[in-house]
């Protein structure tokens, strides 16, 4: 049940907003304002997510000091806590409050102790994963300052009611961005880059990394001269968790589109500095066709099995080879292909591959470059 008739009107307005063709930064900014009018909060992070790795790829921040960013990502990727975004994305309840998860004792949450209290947000925290078609395209973390101001079930219901619309809006933004991406010159940022981190700042970076970072700076989640963009911090945090406690996350790799319109792959890894203190580095490189295909296929609303079939087809497997690899009959595979073609709007395997690589990869890659190079 929503909080009020006014909340229902706001929900409908937000649904229309999510299907209006806004790009991701503008959509997140508009959502921050619209939701705040119904579900009061004092600070928030509205984020885009890579549906394959469930890592944050960009963020719109409301009223949170920039100094809180390292603590936010450290808690999300290095430490165990309640209501992790990745768990919400995989769970049956994609929206949850800290007060409910801790039985009303907020101090049981590390996020509350290490970030909330330190930066003046002593109240409740509401977190949401925005999921559509089984894929998570975004998330939100809403915080309150007043220790007595707990989020209500009506607040949770309202945010849950807009979740699929937000996910669809962010998914559409990714696809629409591919169509309006500018062309590139042959030499722009083609080589992989390496960034070595000291907390949330750069300790060392290769020359090629600077070009990639420039494409992220000024985009939502990164400002020129500011700390690292959200996507880099998220991947570094995930790699740090893998280093720190021996429990690797599902992936330390994320894919996103830069403000220049290119697909960027980020990969976090550990470097042995020889000093006894492990360092975290992030590789920045053009996204590879297989990982790009996974994101694009999710954006078209394909099921997990349909994505598996599409990957086989795009890689050039025959019907018999694809069916054998997926342990299904050729007839079942053909049924999946029919559904895939309908969703993507193509009529053949060749058109499917062309849709993914010509429209989403080659159009944003350096001129003359080849996928996978």
Question: Residue ranges of each PLM-predicted region?
Answer:
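PAS-family sensory domains
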Residues: 189-256
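Short, basic, alpha-helical segments at the C-terminal edge of helix-turn-helix-like DNA-binding modules
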Residues: 349-360
